[in-house]
Amino acid sequence: MPVKQSRFGALKKVSGRLKQIWLGRDEQSQPRPMPRLLVVDDEESICFSMSEYFSLQGFRVDTASELEEAEKLLGVTNYKVVIQDLRLTMTTNQDGLDMIKLIRQQNPQTRIVVLTAYGTAEIEDEARRCGADAFLRKPKPLSQVAQVVQGLIESPPRQAARPA
């Protein structure tokens, strides 16, 4: 007697095939390497929506909701882009600024997009001094975040900071 496939299993199979078509792949073509993306935000709904959106755009996405979790991931994975909030705790931007510095020390080629609701000109200047490539204020449509990410990926590699 044949095994009956669940509706969820059938949907998952169709969803996987649609994703292949969307990304321009079929069984005969070689898959393109998927750029790695890390989303760091204490709001899990933002991590989830960005993960889903960028996965459909052809990225391999990891998420972290705390600084310590992000540090662990950054220690074992080379990300093309990190999209991060500045306030990973409820009180200060320092966690996010420290993370930018950490990324710059560990992998200067990683592109950093800051996405925060606490964006003043002073905070943006500080984030850029720490090494952020782009600074966006929440709320921002995912399509606009994706345009910024794609622009950074297509731009020339970051030059390492030169000692004074």
Please report, for each region that a protein language model flagged, where it lies by residue.
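Two-component/phosphorelay signaling modules centered on CheY-like receiver
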Residues: 44-62
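The short loop immediately C-terminal to the conserved phospho-acceptor aspartate in CheY-like receiver
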Residues: 43, 87-91
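Non-catalytic signal-transmission and effector/linker regions of two-component phosphorelay proteins
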Residues: 1-36, 105, 143-164
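Alpha4 helix (beta4-alpha4-beta5 surface) of REC/receiver domains from two-component response regulators
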Residues: 94-98, 118-136
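Short amphipathic alpha-helix used as the core "switch/output" element in two-component signaling
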Residues: 72, 93-109, 129
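Acidic, metal-coordinating helix/loop segments flanking the phosphotransfer/catalytic sites
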Residues: 63-81, 89, 105
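Two-component signal transduction core modules
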Residues: 82, 112, 135-136
